[in-house]
């Protein structure tokens, strides 16, 4: 599994004061699943990415930056 850098996504969550638990609930997954995804132990599904973008005000053109920046 490739590793991605989610620091920008985590920063957006902090900026909007949205916890992993709250975002997980909006997406319809457990807080554990959200944490696993943010720590590269589980892949985000397409529908999860779309809901996260909608919830955090991330444009579709921002998806590569927030979700697919490789962790070096």
Q: Residues of each region from the PLM?
A:
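A short, Lys/Arg-rich alpha-helix, primarily the initiator
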Residues: 1-16
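Residue-level signal for the short linker/turn that defines the boundary of a DNA-recognition helix
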Residues: 18, 44-47
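Short amphipathic recognition helices of helix-turn-helix/homeodomain-type DNA-binding modules
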Residues: 63-72
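Recognition helix of helix-turn-helix/homeodomain-like DNA-binding domains
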Residues: 28-44
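Short alpha-helical "recognition helix" segments of helix-turn-helix
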Residues: 23-24
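Short coil turns linking two alpha-helices in DNA-binding domains
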Residues: 19, 30-33, 59
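DNA major-groove recognition helix of helix-turn-helix/homeodomain DNA-binding modules
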Residues: 47-62
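DNA major-groove recognition helix of helix-turn-helix
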Residues: 38, 48, 67
